[in-house]
């Protein structure tokens, strides 16, 4: 069942007995990389998981205009240089652009000029392309995922607030944000895609005290926190799961002695919730470089990390039976 504010609203997970093993696949931070999303779905089907969970930051960050010129050629700028192709190269170009997490957009010289002069036009195009891409991605679930597997997506800090509505409207995917989901008869999952402040000033950031209040509100819906799964996009502060490069005022990594200086950037509120409630599992993401697993008290916490720009899926295959964790396996490919 799925509950919002403590009320049962939707039954979408197959009932499983307490003595049966439950298997989940957890990945995060795909950032518009179509290859990574497809691998996530394929791996979920191949591994026959009960629940496939995408922990946040599903959408891409920018569009790449593919501009048709008067000569019938197409030009686009990617990876530091301008590419010129004819119509026979469009399919490959679109695939390459999508593969690294950008959104290709076919346009003409007139519209492209308007986009360079009007930021509002760029935002409108981005909205339309992001919306159509997500809809197409979610349509793949029915094609690739067995009916016995359910897919849960929780928007992350880089996902615009309108993404929630797009997820809610699609019948094959469940929006985890702020909800309690019965993964099986003995384990509930509560999800939050909001994070503590970052230098990037993204859509779902808030101060630690506000994030703590939000998490407390979400957790209050859980019946048994000791067997719960906390699917919180922000990793807990000062753990191996939250180390990221220290940045200068221009947002460039600081290098000392030939090495990038790394600092903890996770959430103190998330760590406080884990230490206070000691849930069964903590599923985290947000910090791409900090993949790994660790325990905080009795709680097993993971961050798969992300290499979305390379089209690589990084995930954890997690299996448990009752209060016993029987598998915690890193998946990469």
Regions found by a protein language model. Give the residues of each.
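Binuclear metal-dependent hydrolase catalytic cores centered on His/Asp/Glu-rich metal-binding motifs
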Residues: 185-228, 260-264
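Binuclear metal-dependent phosphoesterase catalytic core
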Residues: 13-14, 32, 180-185, 202, ...
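Active-site-proximal beta-strand elements of phosphoester/diester hydrolases
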Residues: 21-31, 186-198, 229-233, 300-306, ...
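Catalytic phosphate/metal-binding cores of nucleic-acid and nucleotide-processing enzymes, i.e., regions
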Residues: 34-39, 47, 65, 254, ...
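Active-site environment of divalent metal-dependent phosphoester hydrolases
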Residues: 31-35, 59-63, 154-164, 181, ...
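Core catalytic region of metal-dependent phosphoesterases/phosphodiesterases
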Residues: 2, 11, 36-184
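Active-site-proximal segments of metal-dependent phosphoesterases and phosphodiesterases across multiple
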Residues: 119-131, 229-278
């Amino acid at each position: 069942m799925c509950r919002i504010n403590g009320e049962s609203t939707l039954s979408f997970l197959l009932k499983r007995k307490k003595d049966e093993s439950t298997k989940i696949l957890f990945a995060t931070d795909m950032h518009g990389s179509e290859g990574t999303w497809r691998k996530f779905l394929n791996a979920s089907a191949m591994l026959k998981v009960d629940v496939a969970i995408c922990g946040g930051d599903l959408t891409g960050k920018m569009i790449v205009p593919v501009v048709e010129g008067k000569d019938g050629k197409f030009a686009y700028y990617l990876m530091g240089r301008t590419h010129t192709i004819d119509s026979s190269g469009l399919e490959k170009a679109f695939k390459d652009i999508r593969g690294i997490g950008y959104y290709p957009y076919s346009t003409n010289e007139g519209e492209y000029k308007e986009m360079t002069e009007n930021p509002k036009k760029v935002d409108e195009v981005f909205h339309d392309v992001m919306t159509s891409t997500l809809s197409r991605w979610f349509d793949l679930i029915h094609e690739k995922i067995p009916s016995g597997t359910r897919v849960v997506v929780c928007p992350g800090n880089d996902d615009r607030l309108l993404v929630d509505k797009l997820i809610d409207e699609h019948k094959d995917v469940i929006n985890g944000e702020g909800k309690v989901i019965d993964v099986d008869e003995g384990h509930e999952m509560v999800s939050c895609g909001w994070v503590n402040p970052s230098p990037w000033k993204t859509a779902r950031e808030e101060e630690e005290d506000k994030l703590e209040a939000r998490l407390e509100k979400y957790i209050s819906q859980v019946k048994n926190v000791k067997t719960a799964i906390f699917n919180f996009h922000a990793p807990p502060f000062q753990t191996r799961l939250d180390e990221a490069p220290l940045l200068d005022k221009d947002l460039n990594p600081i290098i000392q002695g030939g090495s990038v200086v790394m600092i903890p950037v996770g959430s103190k509120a998330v760590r406080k919730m884990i230490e206070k409630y000691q849930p069964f599992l903590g599923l985290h993401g947000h910090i791409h470089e900090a993949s790994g697993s660790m325990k905080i008290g009795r709680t097993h916490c993971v961050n798969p990390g992300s290499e979305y720009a390379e089209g690589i899926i990084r995930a954890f295959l997690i299996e448990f039976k009752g209060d016993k964790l029987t598998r915690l396996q890193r998946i990469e490919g």
